[in-house]
Amino acid sequence: MGADSTINTTGLQESAGEGIKSSRLSICIVTYNASDWLVGCLDSIRENNQLESLEIIVVDNGSEDGIEELLSRDYPYVKFIGNKDNLGYTRPMNQGLQTAQGQYLMQLNPDTKILPGAIAKLIRYMDGHPEIGICGPKVLNRDGSFQKQCRRSEPRPLAMISYFLRLSSLFPNSKMLGGYLLEYEDVDATLEVDALSGSCMLIRREVVEEIGYLDEQFFAYQEDTDICSRARQAGWKVYYYPEAEIIHYGGQGGSRVEPYRSIIEWHRSYWLYYKKHLANDYFFLINWLYYLLMVVKLVLAVCINFLRQERYAGPKRG
């Protein structure tokens, strides 16, 4: 698996009246210098009194924040996999998923807070709907507002042009212009969708046994859309289930890299997804226009990031 060190642990045991049976759930978290956020995430899981037991696996990307010692001391039930370098998100998440023993596998970001009952609600909903292969909760921002990216359609040309030009915000009730983030749909409605956010996503084990794990061509973005797409192609359904809720603080996760690489990988992931799943649906001129759009947006994003750094340049933290 490419891991350097592992802590052998037992499962987390907590009693509850209507909990999840033992060995049914594995939660996999990738972290990179995010120990403060991870502690909050783990505490929110531990405080979720509707769980009887679960397996928690933390995969570290070469952090320098003492995370291994912290977990060994304060969270001895957590299984730890340590990498020497920052491998992004997809590869280390696969390390965790391939180690996991649970019937259900959950991808979870370290900068999240599980709200009461969320995990149990997701599992009960999937238990009652065996056709669902992947399910995700309602994701909230730190201020309690809805995080629109938690449920999405595929990044098709018109949807993405509308998204990039912010037409979806101007015409949120339009299925044509508001399609990528499904802005015309009720945020409190259970909904079959094309894709969910990897910040919190519950996957049935049979899905990865059938279609494989995350595609490691994706460094850190659109890997969630890709696995959802492959699941749908295999006949599984993907559902957004807002009865379960989490908070995602954002930007403090496990794959943080230099800003320019992050920008490049973000745009590359859209190009890769389009080439892999959508290009055959369109005439080649449409495809080249889409690729050109991505290049133009990439150049603009790099320039904007450079100008922001110049504008806000100041003393660095020592």
For each of these PLM feature ranges, what is it?
Residues N83-A100, K121:
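Glycine-rich, basic loop-to-helix element that forms the pyrophosphate-binding segment
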Residues D186-E245:
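A short, conserved alpha-helix in the catalytic core of glycosyltransferases
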Residues D43-S53:
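Short, acidic, metal-binding catalytic loop of nucleotide-sugar glycosyltransferases
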Residues E154-V193:
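Short, flexible, basic/aromatic active-site loop/helix in glycosyltransferases
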Residues S229-E310:
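Active-site-adjacent helix/loop segment of glycosyltransferases
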Residues L115-Q149:
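Conserved donor NDP-sugar-binding/catalytic core segment of glycosyltransferases
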Residues L105:
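Short aromatic/hydrophobic "clamp" motif used to bind/position activated sugar donors
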Residues S44, D60-E68, D85:
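A conserved acidic beta->alpha catalytic loop
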